Amino acid sequence: MATTLTTDLRLSIAHQTRFGLRLASAISSDPESAATNVAFSPVSLHVALSLVAAGARGATRDQLVAVLGGGGAGEAEALQSLAEQVVQFVLADASINSGPRIAFANGVFVDASLSLKPSFQELAVCNYKSEVQSVDFKTKAPEAASQVNSWVKNVTAGLIEEILPAGSIDNTTRLVLGNALYFKGLWTKKFDESKTKYDDFHLLNGSTVQTPFMSSTNKQYLSSSDGLKVLKLPYQHGGDNRQFSMYILLPEAHDGLSRLAQKLSTEPDFLENRIPTEEVEVGQFMLPKFKISFGFEANKLLKTLGLQLPFSLEANLSEMVNSPMGLYISSVFHKTFVEVDEEGTKAGAATGDVIVDRSLPIRMDFVANHPFLFLIREDIAGVVLFIGHVANPAVSS
């Protein structure tokens, strides 16, 4: 993906980000989900559904385009172009060059009774780096599930062992999307493990739990406005133009998570206008360690965003298979893994330039001791890899 982005590509990325933020808002507004730790990858879901759009026609394709890309002439082609560039550049593993470890798995699994179109299979494999497999859902559903799970375990080198939970498919299943993304990066500034101490984290129900908090006296990228503090934690990058960062969005109100997610989804520039660009001196600084492994069936949430036809008998997936009568997406299964701890760069990698701050020193506290939202973004392109929230860091969900 070029460092200088075209206007059309920036617009496509903005649509992709808005899709993810709308999903995050839907998750946060659900009482059950709001009380648990959540993580999902809007970019990998977007890529998977863009592939479905390439195999769809008529009103089904129009609906996919409207939800994923905002509609308009040529938008279906823009979806495909964006997906290809994201898969090739943003989601490529960078660990060989000391960048983040990224493992992306995207699969389309169709019952063996259906004949896949060669053109769709070629598009999926070559342009989307996706797996397209014919499996026997009709007579061997458990074996088919095992086949899908083995695939995701293999693609993610064992980081994600299972994407289809037990009983999630049966002999009526015809088409399943499997989607997983793993990310593990090293901070450019390491947290000193000896400074990690247990303290109280305040839950949404008013109770507290003891959990380990990382702390630091280093300058941090911080911004504060309108009852929201935003922390930017850059990851060590490899030998390419990508720069990944984690953002912690901490509402001042202990119960402000749902309202924050709603603002992010309804105000297009809310996030961009609050991304910190300068390092500041910190006063009290506390960030909990957390580990989230989160899987869910995305159908219900996608329907709330207006994506109905691909999951119904009215679906038109005629560019995907021959004789597609009655074929629709049975399920979209999505799983992610996110881990935040003290790990930083290897010795000496972060030393070098000295930044001189000519303004008056301002110390800003950042104490993430209540529920907060986070995201991981590739900053050059603005592509959001993960969105999630931490409701209880003491639980490895």
From Swiss-Prot:
One Pfam family recorded for the sequence: Serpin
- Note whether Calcium occurs among the keywords: no
Segments carrying the region annotation (RCL) are 344-368
Chain positions with N-acetylalanine modification:
A2
Give the UniProt tissue specificity note.
Highly expressed in endosperm, at intermediate level in embryo and at lower levels in roots.
Which terms does the record give in the GO molecular function aspect? Answer: serine-type endopeptidase inhibitor activity
Q: Which keywords has UniProt assigned to this entry? A: Acetylation, Protease inhibitor, Serine protease inhibitor
UniProt site positions, description: Reactive bond: R358, S359
Is Acetylation set as a keyword in this record?
yes
Q: Which GO terms describe its cellular component?
A: extracellular space
- What is stated as this protein's family in its record? Belongs to the serpin family.
Q: What does this protein do?
A: Inhibits chymotrypsin in vitro.
Free-text note regarding domains: The reactive center loop (RCL) extends out from the body of the protein and directs binding to the target protease. The protease cleaves the serpin at the reactive site within the RCL, establishing a covalent linkage between the carboxyl group of the serpin reactive site and the serine hydroxyl of the protease. The resulting inactive serpin-protease complex is highly stable.
Q: Which PANTHER family match?
A: SERINE PROTEASE INHIBITOR, SERPIN, SERPIN DOMAIN-CONTAINING PROTEIN
Q: What is this protein called?
A: Serpin-Z7
Q: Which organism is it from?
A: Hordeum vulgare (Barley)
Q: What is the lineage of its organism?
A: Eukaryota, Viridiplantae, Streptophyta, Embryophyta, Tracheophyta
